[in-house]
Amino acid sequence: MAKVLVLKSSILGDYSQSAKLIDHLQQHWQGQGAEVTVRDLAAQPLPVLDGEIAMGLRGGDELSPRQQEVLALSDELVAELKAHDTLVIAAPMYNFSIPTQLKNWIDLVARAGVTFTYTETGPKGLVEGKRAVLVTTRGGVHKNGASDHVVPYLKTVLGFIGIDEVETVYGEALNMGPEANEQGISQAKQSIEQLVA
């Protein structure tokens, strides 16, 4: 049975376009018997990386209670990622980039010696044998353009930790009028259905 980890990161709750697409994807995967775990990074926000947390993520014997708590949370997030075959990331574009909530997850998961390591030939990802699906929504049209700092960034981060098989579902032009919105959502749903077929 396929095991799918879904990360939602929209701050818009029921109004979220990316969450609606993720729900569509989740229904299709569950219909095929997949086990789906959903982590809503906006509803259950993670701590923001700061100096104390950064030092704590390195481990050690003399950690503050806060550092111990965040290190345990980071270990939990990494274990959750490694326990699933497929990672699905809902990544709406906010001001040309990803939501803060998603960046917080990345900062707690991308850890030297845990999800990647440095070798004589350069960095090597340690989260191997996984597949990722990015579901990204935008008010305008940014696919493959210089203004898209969502997909290239996420592909770089995922590749850095060892996840090289990455597919992307785009929902674009969603704020460019009702017709454009309907068309953008429809095309994204078609991409989802092809992806899970």
Swiss-Prot record:
Names of required cofactors: FMN
A GO molecular function held by the record: FMN binding
Alphabetic keyword roster: Flavoprotein, FMN, NAD, Oxidoreductase
Binding site for FMN: S10, S16, Q17, S18, M93, Y94, N95, F96, T137, R138, G139, G140
InterPro entries reported for this sequence: Flavodoxin_fold (IPR003680), Flavoprotein-like_sf (IPR029039), FMN-dep_NADH:Q_OxRdtase_AzoR1 (IPR050104), NADH:quinone_OxRdtase_FMN_depd (IPR023048)
Pfam families from the UniProt entry: Flavodoxin_2 (PF02525)
EC number in record: 1.6.5.-, 1.7.1.17
TM region positions: none
Protein name (record): FMN-dependent NADH:quinone oxidoreductase
